[in-house]
Amino acid sequence: MERCSRCHRLLLFLPLVLGLSAAPGWAGAPSVDVLRALRFPSLPDGVRRSKGVCPGDVAYRVARPAQLSAPTRQLFPGGFPKDFSLLTVVRTRPGLQAPLLTLYSAQGVQQLGLELGRPVRFLYEDQRGRPQASAQPIFRGLSLADGKWHHVAVAVKGQSVTLIVDCKKRVTRPLPRSVHPVLDTHGVVIFGAHILDDEVFEGDVQELLVVPGVQAAYQSCGQKDLECEREQRDGPQTQKPHRAQRSPKKEPARLHKPQSQEPQKQPTESLYYDYEPPYYDVMTTGTAPDYQYPTPGEEEGVLESSPLPFLEEEQTDLQVSPTADSFQAEEYGEGGTDSPAGFYDYTYGYGDDYREETELGPALSAETAHSGAVAHGPRGLKGEKGEPAVLEPGMFVEGPPGPEGPAGLAGPPGIQGNPGPVGDPGERGPPGRAGLPGSDGPPGPPGTSLMLPFRFGSSGGDKGPVVAAQEAQAQAILQQARLALRGPPGPMGYTGRPGPLGQPGSPGLKGESGDLGPQGPRGPQGLTGPPGKAGRRGRAGADGARGMPGEPGMKGDRGFDGLPGLPGEKGQRGDTGAQGLPGPPGEDGERGDDGEIGPRGLPGESGPRGLLGPKGPPGIPGPPGVRGMDGPHGPKGSLGPQGEPGPPGQQGTPGAQGLPGPQGAIGPHGEKGARGKPGLPGMPGSDGLPGHPGKEGPPGTKGNQGPSGPQGPLGYPGPRGVKGVDGIRGLKGHKGEKGEDGFPGFKGDIGVKGDRGEVGVPGSRGEDGPEGPKGRTGPTGDPGPTGLMGEKGKLGVPGLPGYPGRQGPKGSLGFPGFPGASGEKGARGLSGKSGPRGERGPTGPRGQRGPRGATGKSGAKGTSGGDGPHGPPGERGLPGPQGPNGFPGPKGPPGPAGKDGLPGHPGQRGEVGFQGKTGPPGPPGVVGPQGTAGESGPMGERGHSGPPGPPGEQGLPGTSGKEGTKGDPGPPGAPGKDGPAGLRGFPGERGLPGTAGGPGLKGNEGPAGPPGPAGSPGERGAAGSGGPIGPPGRPGPQGPPGAAGEKGVPGEKGPIGPTGRDGVQGPVGLPGPAGPPGVAGEDGDKGEVGDPGQKGTKGNKGEHGPPGPPGPIGPVGQPGAAGADGEPGARGPQGHFGAKGDEGTRGFNGPPGPIGLQGLPGPSGEKGETGDGGPMGPPGPPGPRGPAGPNGADGPQGSPGGVGNLGPPGEKGEPGESGSPGVQGEPGVKGPRGERGEKGESGQAGEAGPPGPKGPTGDNGPKGNPGPVGFPGDPGPPGEAGPRGQDGAKGDRGEDGEPGQPGSPGPTGENGPPGPLGKRGPAGTPGPEGRQGEKGAKGDPGAVGAPGKTGPVGPAGLAGKPGPDGLRGLPGSVGQQGRPGATGQAGPPGPVGPPGLPGLRGDAGAKGEKGHPGLIGLIGPTGEQGEKGDRGLPGPQGSPGQKGETGIPGASGPIGPGGPPGLPGPSGPKGAKGATGPAGPKGEKGVQGPPGHPGPPGEVIQPLPIQMPKKTRRSVDGSKLIQDEEAVPTGGAPGSPAGLEEIFGSLDSLREEIEQMRRPAGTQDSPARTCQDLKLCHPELPDGEYWVDPNQGCARDAFRVFCNFTAGGETCVTPRDDVTQFSYVDSEGSPVGVVQLTFLRLLSVSAHQDVSYPCSGVSQDGPLKLRGANEDELSPETSPYVKEFRDGCQTQQGRTVLEVRTPVLEQLPVLDASFADLGAPTRRGGVLLGPVCFMG
């Protein structure tokens, strides 16, 4: 029974196999058959049929020109599943690395892909760009490009992906995607190709499915193998196999060819397969033959077998269906177990090469299947058993089959079979009635043709094969998307043959809404339904007509506080109240007086070690140290560096003009120059086109609480309130401000002597006294500890040539140089003065014999005389050949400085020398060129106040000063003396440790310490054993010169190499050796006076002896004593360079030399490290008044404060400390001219300044517009003086004020003693602003001042007489509906809208003829619950139903917003005469009249009627105030009910308008300034699109933006979808103006924008340069505000995202972009701009 149970298990799997082989339906899941969706069965271009894995399977051969794609929405209409399985059976061309399936988003981003080859790549990217390119899973060690069939299953679940290959290898990799990943289904699905890649898939594919969930990937293995096993045993059929029977005999059966294809009636013996290796080599479980990738020619005849792992399990008895066609197994060649290249051909008895029946098997015996009778097997003939010949142990050779045996006995009848399949289709029925034509659908919006980069199948032609509804929909969408063109309908094709019976289909997609059916009978009345949900908030309706006055309502909420009433009459004194509860703690009091100085605290903890301080000033040269002992004589050094160029020789005559030399190489890139002056502002450019919409950014963090909103305008005064009940007596008020000094009292008695006062507050720092004499030199300090070794500094700029060093040891002879070009012959130089006598040269050859002289006259014979004098010298002989060069003579005195020679070629970089000691400071050089501006360092210590400088030149007249606060009048006191300096404050608390600083630059060496005693030389240690090779250390100091090496042979000159690329600018090289002498140049300009040379010793003039033979070099003599300085000798010839001398011991620092001549300008130094901030210095003297700064930005207005009750006047407090200046307020409206102010007190005497020139007379300012007429308010008592506000913006010049009273003259101060002129110190960094000094004593009256400026605006005057304007009338009732107006003219065309959504399905085509009725399909499995259908079209109007029962009252809805003002009503009755309006603006100043006569004595002013106390009494209902007739007459006055109603109506409408101003709603009629303001007013709003108007004013220029409240209230402006130029638009597509963007920048503190671009497989992508709105170049290399958010260029296809996040708001938005490698083959695609978001 064990074998039979396996049979049952196998039979249970077979129905699943049948379901799997038909496309959609892995175990019933809603899978997607990608091959069907891409129309593989219709064989598009590049696709043809081939044979699959198992016999009878159909695969598709894909060649290179195939281009297969479909919209993703068509395959996955309900969205792509989160966890899924991707299943495929595929065979690729060997060695191929190509994609199999790729899914792109609407923006062209690759979201999903499977790439086959070595290795296998799985690509995935969700909506948040995760995982990143570096984390994409790669399955290394797997190769699917071997030309064999492979079952591949990919299971994606959660954060991992598993690849299953051939049911054997299973590899899992992490997939770090988002928790809720989403893939965009608005793009396309592409088979076998990438958009940006040329590699395409070539090979065979039999199956490609996408199934939700991961179960299908794990269950596919067993089902696939069982399917192939069934094909092997049963032959190609779709009939369900019968239940297997147990055979009565256990004898293994042989595979025979059936006698007949018809089922035989007589009972026959059942056949059993027996898979034993000796008898049937095809089924061996050994090594299966390798799969060969057939050529196209052999494709039809060869069909590879697949591995059969299931044969290893057990032999299975399975009855063979008698209806199978001929099933043969033939061997070709020497195939089998030992032949790796064997092929097996399974042939079937079909007449056609290919028909659709290959998927279904041969024609089935429907009669047998339907009758339910037992199907008996045919009678078999028993064969003779062949005897296997044993060759070797365990090896068998199969013998030939024996002859057919006799027919066996009839087998027992089989058990009842399962019901057969559906029978053949019946005859064609009569055609049905034509259906009603469907109603036209609504026209769809234009479809998107974003990304369809591949060709699709050809259109038109004969009627194609039967396709599923999904394929038809795909074809329709693809045809529509193909450039949105539709050709004329083709001719009607022939009616196709009826197709074969198909497998049960998967549950279909949701159908479209059907036509409306006929109206059904009216149903019974339903039960009362539950109360519905609260409806959406309706739009505000128009105001209705004014209703009748209602009954008195409940007592309302407390109204707004009214203005303070008039002071009431004094009431009677109340009884003393009970002891009140202790009040809440009072507010913090004002700062008390400074306390006594406490005792000195304990010393604080030692702070952390500070950073290396700045270089100190050079110390005083120390005393000379003790001379050290002479060191041992060192070995001979190696070849020293090339010496400094010698002084040039005498000037040669100018040579002929040489030919122009060849063009030099491009020099290195110069340093960035100083920033130029800003250019003239350009004309404002036109608004650009909007850019592409960016991806939705990730939600940001919630921002900080924003500033308070602007203060609203003051409302109208409310109605006068009823007198309240006497309140509880308030707490004692705070001490008031100090009052003005009263009149001087009478002189008091002499008081008792007071106690000793407290120690006074340290006085301000006095002026520096005269400079004291220089102190004595202090003792030399102890040597400091050895400092830490600094890091190696950067290569410095080459210094100026140093002084000549001592003579060094002679270097070895260098290689001979290349012979130089022979120079032109120079002019003969002047004869040099005689040089010192050289050594005797070799004797020259004998001169030629001179010519014979003329025969002399014979003289008389003289007497023999004595030796006569020498005769005259004979003629000069010819010059002899040049003798060898003599030995170099002794070093001559240095000649005068020659002219500068030509610069030599740069030499090779020498080794790093020893670190030299710091010499004494040299004389100051000339002022060098201005270097680039360094970054501002931290604030240094505050320097001492310098002596007062001489008075400056006459300054320009300053701008008009702001009105100062009124000072307290102090008693005139004598000027006090400067107090002594205060004690030093205590050390502060230890600060928190600072962040670790970067590595500091190498510090300068400190001053030399006293030399230490010389140590005794140590013994030489033994040589250690060689250690392992360590890492390369830092370059050590220069070692002693090594022994001279042997001279190398110069190598042959190599061939000229190819021209290399321009190299990167190298570091500045050391001076090279002198080059060959160049052509003599023209006379240069006169050089500057050089430094005086060292005075040389006078040489002895040697005699000019004959050259002698060279003698041996003698030993080096001891140095002789220095001779006395001789007179300068004659100028000698230029001497040879001496060899480098030994390095001497360091001498003592000499005293500073005299100030030298101005040196050459040095190169600009590198930028120094930022210094530490110094402690705050003492407050300096007040500096001169600086120029007026620009007006600051408008600050936000504060929220309006409620009007408080009038408090009792407090005592005047001490003057408080000066507060920090407040935010600049908005410029106020020009107020009316104030009345003449009271005479101010005499101010402090200022220092006598130089009289300024008279300024030009300004124009009179424009007269202000009269303000709106306000309601007369009750005059309030004068309020307390508020804190001093920030100075407002400079207003227009007011009209000339009356001349002020001349001030009293003040005495001129004495001139102080002139201070000594100090040395000019370095410019210190400006110190922090000191605290405001204490108020000084009142000075003496100043000199007569110029006429004073216009005084401040005085307080508002008393209310004027009533004006003629009446009050606002009552709103009228609603008028009748007007007639519709005439049609207006057509407006201008609107802006281009954004691309629309994908279009709806197009109009239905012409209805074709009705086809033949198809076969009745099998009953499919029950589909899953479909999605809820779309809402149908509205049905016809039903008959009115009966009135239902009264429903349950619904919940009270939210109170709706106030509706807009209603239509103007009809004119009401004429209102009563209104109260007199306020006084108009003051008129212009008239001509001053003559003084009037003295007036009569004054009278008591009666209060105005509005100021008179009103006696009120409350009516019965409390809703009105009934006033006595003596107060105000009734009839429309403010006290009457009609007047109050009108006032309240006006107040309500005003309150709504003010509320909209205070809390804008972000709509087009009520736009906010920024999204930040909107978030502050409405923190509950979600992210979305709202209207903003940054420049306020009229709301017609408001634009729509995206508000990211999640990120704290960012205002995001979208770029326009246009590739020609970058511009920015609102959400409606309208361009955003430059002015609005400027205001948006002013209201923001930072901005950011993302820029992305696609790239393809480059390790170093060319940089993208961006141009900001202020023409700045932005890139990660040039700007610290540009970061690479994601670098996707390292992978095959990726996308690099740059993020520009800058506080320099003028840089954004980005206006242009360029690639450095534009035109490269790897540069594809464009730039995608994200929205620019401003953060307020």
UniProtKB/Swiss-Prot annotation:
Residues 258-269 have a biased composition (Polar residues). GO terms for molecular function: extracellular matrix structural constituent; metal ion binding. Ca(2+) binds at D1589, N1591, Q1592, C1594, D1597. Residues 1501-1736 form a propeptide. Residues 994-1003, 1198-1207 have a biased composition (Gly residues). Residues 615-624, 1029-1040, 1176-1187, 1388-1397, 1457-1467 have a biased composition (Pro residues). Residues 215-486 are annotated as: Nonhelical region. Pfam families: COLFI (PF01410), Collagen (PF01391), Laminin_G_2 (PF02210). Residues 57-228 form the Laminin G-like domain. Residues 1-27 form the signal peptide. It comes from the Eukaryota. Disulfide bonds join C1571-C1603, C1612-C1733, C1655-C1689. Residues 765-774, 1232-1241, 1287-1296 have a biased composition (Basic and acidic residues). Residues 487-1500 are annotated as: Triple-helical region. May play an important role in fibrillogenesis by controlling lateral growth of collagen II fibrils. This is Collagen alpha-2(XI) chain. It comes from Mus musculus (Mouse).
